[in-house]
């Protein structure tokens, strides 16, 4: 499992960050844009609503992924891999230049899930609510630029309410290499701190 995949599963922004969205003009004043003409186009399942926004094109998006049930988590406890189940919903926007090339993705994800030890049947709950900003280095080239995730991060706890782990801080990821190029604060989950993961394993043993 890459650092990026694990961070996308775990990293959360639980503070009061709010997407920076320009005040919308009345719907009647918007000039609609066909999402399929953009580079790259937002997937249809994102329910994009695209329109001319000054010198740019903006697409509002909102969607939920299919539920994930008992997927491998990448966290191994004494030879047993914990299973992850979760839901994910997303709201946000994409900004394109006047030629229809993607410049920025700005979105907020809400996750709720569990880690389950299949041997013991014990479960830990986790939640996250992260805000991400992906600024493309090359307009239209999705695999370039940096993605920033910041703010207070994930909480993992037991059903009786006892907190097992928290993860908080600021991360900058190089999208092309999938590497974290800047990190601040406390990230035991993102970086797989053995002591932190041992605490989770012990709670589910």
Model-derived segments and spans:
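Beta-strand-enriched cores of mature, soluble protein domains
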Residues: 30-205
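Secretory targeting and sorting signals
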Residues: 1-30
């Amino acid at each position: 499992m890459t650092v990026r995949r694990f961070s996308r599963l775990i990293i959360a922004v639980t503070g009061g960050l709010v997407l920076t969205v320009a005040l919308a003009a009345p719907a009647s004043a918007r000039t609609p844009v066909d999402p399929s003409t953009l580079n790259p186009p937002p997937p249809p399942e994102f329910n994009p609503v695209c329109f001319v926004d000054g010198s740019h094109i903006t697409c509002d998006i909102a969607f939920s992924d299919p539920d994930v049930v008992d997927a491998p988590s990448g966290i191994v406890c004494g030879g047993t891999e914990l299973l992850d189940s979760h839901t994910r919903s997303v709201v946000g926007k994409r900004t394109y230049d006047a030629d229809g090339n993607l410049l920025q993705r700005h979105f907020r994800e809400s996750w709720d899930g569990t880690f389950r030890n299949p041997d013991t049947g014990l479960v830990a709950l986790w939640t996250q609510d992260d805000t991400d900003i992906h600024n493309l280095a090359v307009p239209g080239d999705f695999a370039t630029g940096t993605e920033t995730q910041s703010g207070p991060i994930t909480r993992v706890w037991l059903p009786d309410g006892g907190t097992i782990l928290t993860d908080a801080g600021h991360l900058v990821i190089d999208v092309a290499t999938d590497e974290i190029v800047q990190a601040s604060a406390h990230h035991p989950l993102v970086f797989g701190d053995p002591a932190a993961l041992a605490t989770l394993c012990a709670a589910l043993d």
